[in-house]
Every structure is written in structure tokens, then in C-alpha cells.
Curated annotation (Swiss-Prot):
Subunit (UniProt): Heterooligomer composed of large and small subunits.
Annotated signal peptide: none
Protein name from the UniProt record: Exodeoxyribonuclease 7 large subunit
Pfam families found in the cross-reference section: Exonuc_VII_L (PF02601), tRNA_anti_2 (PF13742)
Protein's organism: Rhodopirellula baltica (strain DSM 10527 / NCIMB 13988 / SH1)
Gene name tied to this protein: xseA
């Protein structure tokens, strides 16, 4: 609070609300007359005198109340109402003040506002022109932190699924911090005790005060332009108050860390300090020293791990050689390796035996097939018309090739062909005779 007059719009607990007595001011008045209009003053004059009295009587007054009906026109000014249980007053915060407000003013907030009471003569009303504002019950920075944290949390910027793993053995590490601060000294001291073969690049940046946010973001951009690009990007500073660390709660810096293509580590302040940069980074280190232990592999641990790996490889190799040697000995004990020529002779005799058996089987199958074929041929020959002709029979056909089966099939003068076993006989029918009982006649 300042030395300025202050009062609360909330009930003070007494039957009467708290009052502020303005300094007495002599007001010019004309000598009154009971019936003349010459005694009256104009509304403008009355308003002017009220404005002069009020504005000079309440300079830099602190007012406690609840924000309602807040309006945010495109001009950037803020218009709202401050109220308590019994009264209310209109308030205005010009753009130049609103832009410097660390938290977002909203309906329902209980605040302390310091400003000047101003009379608006055109309407005969008054308002509080706010020059300072802070939340009640929670500091302005704490409120701003909570508001921005809720906003970014709703966007998913702090979700564990976004977090990336750090490389096990980075080749190049970039750290954006003050070149003269304790953070870089602590980090380098811890790094020297862990692994000396990793390149560490310091990107100088302002970490506190005006322009620090832009400086930190420029440092991150510089890291992304490096070739080869760093495997890990650390944003760091030493401890301090909430105000000292406030740059690491800035929305622009937090979004820049979230958008980084390089895995990020936030190492800000001491163990008890938590910034929004800590929440959005892939890895949060409690201190710059802790950042070194998380990013850089421990040299002694790596040597021990390599020794253990070498021992394990040697053991596995020995077991494999022993196993393969046993397999080779088992193969060597088989007969094929004991007397290979005898095995070849035995297999050769088996091949000759199978060859003889195959040939005999083939000849037997061939003889059986020939005998079966002769039987079938004899049966076919017995049924053949040629065999019938050979026994003295013949077949007579007309010129049209029709077989003559009856005397009625021919007429005198027909030409006939008679097939015998050794050739054909051509004849002409002179007459035909039918057996008794047939109706055909010559």
C-alpha cells in the first residue's frame, strides 16, 4: 500500500460503511435571495465545482471491490464495475496500464485498485481511473501463473505424451543462459565430473528483466540454426524470487520451448521453484547441476557398463564356442566320419542291388504286358469280319455300299460287289430266288 488514502467497498463490519472525509474546500456562492433566480448557479458550474472538489479530494485512492461487467473494446482500454454488497463504481483502465497488468482481469475477481476519482461532467457521473491493480488473497504474479497454466494445460502443452526422450549419449549440448550467472558455472562444474568428450555450446542470453524473453527465444533460434544441430537444448538460470524467474513463465517462451525440434531440458532456479518452462520442457531438471546429471552420461558408469558388456560378450562367446565344439565332436563320432570309404562301398553295393532289382522288375512287367496284349489281339481277331471271310464267308453290297441281307434288297440288273477274303467280285443280278415261304418272286 502507498501513503495515499484507502478505503474498502466491502462492509467494514460496523453498522455504517467506512467513510473517507475529503478536505474542506471553500466553494464560491452568490448571496442568496429567497425569491430571485439570480441566486441559482448553472449545472455546468455546479458540476465543475463538484469535479474540482472530488478530483482534488481523492488523489491516488485504493479501492477494494469485485470486478463485474468487464468490457474489452478494440482500443485496448478496459471498462468495468467495482462493487461491494451495497455500492458500486465504474472503473476504467487505460491501454497503457492494461498492457502492463501481469494477470488477466476477469469478472468475479476480488481486487485492490489504486487510481484517481474522475468526474465525467457531460453525464454528471464519476469513475475510478485505475493506475494499479492487484488481486486480493493471491499475488498478481501467482494469479497470472495460475491463469496461463490453466490455459496451456487445456491446449495439451503439458501432456506426458508430448515428452521426448533424451539421447543416451549426446554429441553436442547447447545451453541458453547468462554467461556470467551461477547456472553455467554449476553446469560446467558438474559436466567436467561426468563426461569430457561431449561438446557443450554456451549461447549467451539475458535471463531476467526487460528483453529477457526475447533474448532467450533468440538463443533457442540460434541453437536450431547450428550445424550440426545440438542433440539437447537446455534453458537455464539460477534461483531467485518469483519476479526474478518470471521470464520463464512468459507465454511466448513457453510456446517456443513447446515448438522446439530439439529435445529440451528446463533447469530453472532451485528445487522448490516450478516455472511453466519446467512443465512444458521434455525434461525438468531441479537445478543446473541436476541438468548435467540428466543430460550427460557419467564417465565412470559408462566405463563400468562397458566392462560389464565386454564380460558378458566374452562369456556368451565362450559358451557358443563350447557348444559348437560339442556339436563337431558329435558329428566326428558318426560312422560316416570314422570309415568313410567303407560307407561309400556299402552305398555302392546298395545302388547296384537296387539297379538289378529295377531291371528285373521292368522285364517282368514288360513280359506281362506283352502276354496280355497277345490275348487281347487274339480275341479281337476272332471277332474281326476278316476272320469270318477267311472261313469262306463273303459280304455283298450294292453300289451304294448297302449290305445285301435279303433277296428283296436287290432287283434284276443291279450291280453288286461281293467281298471275299482275297478280293472283291463284281456281278450283275439277272434274277433272284427266294426260299419257300417268302413273298418275293423273280
Amino acid at each position: 500500500m502507498s501513503d495515499s488514502t484507502q478505503f474498502s467497498l466491502f462492509d467494514s463490519g460496523d453498522d455504517e460503511p467506512a467513510k473517507v472525509t475529503a478536505p474542506k474546500r471553500k466553494v464560491a456562492r452568490k448571496k442568496r435571495s429567497s425569491s430571485s433566480s439570480d441566486d441559482a448557479i448553472s449545472i455546468s458550474e455546479l458540476t465543475r465545482q463538484i469535479k474540482s472538489t472530488v478530483e482534488s479530494g481523492f488523489p491516488g485512492v485504493w479501492v477494494a471491490g469485485e470486478i463485474t461487467d468487464i468490457a474489452r473494446p478494440r482500443s485496448g482500454h478496459l471498462y468495468f464495475t467495482l462493487k461491494d454488497e451495497r455500492s458500486q463504481i465504474r472503473g476504467v483502465m487505460w491501454r497503457s496500464v492494461a498492457e502492463r497488468l501481469p494477470f488477466e482481469l476477469d469478472d468475479g475477481q476480488s481486487v485492490l485498485c489504486m487510481g484517481d476519482v474522475e468526474v465525467y461532467a457531460a453525464r454528471g457521473s464519476y469513475q475510478l481511473v485505475v493506475r494499479k491493480c492487484q488481486p486480493q488473497g493471491m499475488g498478481a504474479l501467482q494469479l497470472a501463473f495460475a491463469q496461463l497454466q490453466a490455459k496451456l494445460q487445456a491446449e495439451g502443452l503439458f501432456e506426458p505424451e508430448r515428452k521426448r526422450l533424451l539421447p543416451r549419449v549426446p554429441r553436442r549440448v547447447a545451453i541458453v543462459t547468462s554467461p556470467t550467472g551461477a547456472a553455467i558455472q554449476d553446469f560446467l562444474q558438474a559436466a567436467a565430473q561426468r563426461h569430457a568428450g561431449i561438446e557443450i555450446v554456451l549461447i549467451p542470453a539475458s535471463v531476467q528483466g526487460p528483453g529477457s524473453v526475447e533474448s532467450l527465444i533468440d538463443g533457442m533460434r540460434a541453437a536450431h540454426r547450428m550445424r550440426p544441430q545440438p542433440d539437447v537444448l537446455i534453458v537455464s538460470r539460477g534461483g531467485g524470487s518469483l519476479e526474478d524467474l518470471w521470464s520463464f513463465n512468459d507465454e511466448q517462451l513457453v510456446r517456443a520451448i513447446a515448438a522446439s525440434r530439439i529435445p529440451t531440458v528446463s533447469a530453472v532456479g532451485h528445487e522448490i521453484d516450478v516455472t511453466l518452462a519446467d512443465l512444458v520442457a521434455d525434461v525438468r531438471a531441479l537445478t543446473p547441476t541436476d541438468a548435467a546429471s540428466r543430460v550427460l552420461p557419467d564417465r565412470d558408469s559408462m566405463v563400468a557398463a562397458l566392462d560389464a558388456l565386454g564380460q558378458m560378450m566374452a562369456t556368451n562367446l565362450f559358451r557358443r564356442v563350447h557348444s559348437e565344439r560339442q556339436r563337431l565332436e558329435n558329428w566326428e563320432s558318426r560312422p560316416v566320419f570314422q570309415n568313410p570309404f567303407e560307407m561309400v562301398h556299402d552305398r555302392s553295393r546298395e545302388v547296384d542291388d537296387w539297379d538289378e532289382r529295377g531291371r528285373s522288375a521292368i522285364w517282368r512287367r514288360l513280359e506281362q504286358a506283352q502276354a496280355k496284349l497277345a490275348t487281347v489281339a487274339a480275341a479281337q481277331s476272332a471277332l474281326s469280319p476278316l476272320a469270318v471271310l477267311a472261313r469262306g464267308y463273303s459280304v455283298t453290297q450294292t453300289d451304294a455300299g448297302k449290305v445285301v441281307r435279303s433277296t428283296g434288297d436287290v432287283q434284276p440288273g443291279d450291280s453288286l460287289r461281293t467281298r471275299l477274303t482275297d478280293g472283291d467280285v463284281i456281278s450283275v443280278v439277272s434274277r433272284h430266288e427266294s426260299k419257300p415261304g417268302n413273298s418275293d418272286s423273280a
